[in-house]
Design a protein with these regions (language model features):
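Short, hydrophobic/amphipathic alpha-helical patches that form generic packing surfaces
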Residues: 29-37
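Intrinsically disordered, low-complexity serine/threonine- and proline-rich regulatory segments
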Residues: 1-30
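Generic structural signal for short, flexible, solvent-exposed coil/loop and linker residues
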Residues: 2-3, 9-12, 35, 74-75, ...
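Short helix-capping/hinge SLiMs at alpha-helix to coil transitions
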Residues: 38-45
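Non-transmembrane, amphipathic alpha-helical segments
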Residues: 19-23, 43, 72, 100
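Extended assembly-interface/linker segments at domain junctions
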Residues: 47-137
């Protein structure tokens, strides 16, 4: 495959893939902090009013540390729904609207978690060297 063809494929991917768009959002710290906390568990859903209330309660503190606008929680959630990060549906058992993360949002949050995780950089040969040195000390 030529460089041009590969570059065009990646360009289309960046434009079309919801997870990649999420990773490029200015609100990614807010998305990763709030949505992972409240909806990050497998199969998690939350009534829309509960997520709005939780996010509104957190926005005051988050604004002290992040460069956030004065937007409401409801406005952020609507933006994230339109961006393909949140799905809003009627819950079967409660007959109220709930939010859930989309598969693309979960994928994007996994990438963020992987990048935040400490990396183990000890190689097998380094471990052997350390064990040999410990054995010689004993």
């Amino acid at each position: 495959m030529s460089s041009l063809a590969q570059a065009l494929r990646v360009h289309r991917l960046v434009q079309d893939d919801v997870a990649l768009r999420m990773l490029r959002m200015d609100s990614l710290p807010l998305v990763a902090g709030v949505l992972a906390t409240h909806l990050g568990a497998p199969n998690a859903s939350l009534p829309t009013h509960e997520l709005h209330d939780a996010l509104d309660a957190e926005l005051d503190t988050l604004r002290d540390h992040l460069d956030l606008s004065g937007r409401t929680a409801k406005a952020y959630c609507e933006d994230w729904r339109q961006a393909g990060l949140l799905e809003r549906r009627i819950a079967d058992e409660a007959r109220e609207e709930v939010y859930e993360l989309t598969p693309a949002a979960r994928q994007g949050l996994r990438v963020v978690e992987q990048l935040l995780a400490p990396r183990a950089s000890v190689t097998e040969s380094r471990l052997v060297s350390l064990l040999t040195a410990l054995h010689q000390l004993a």
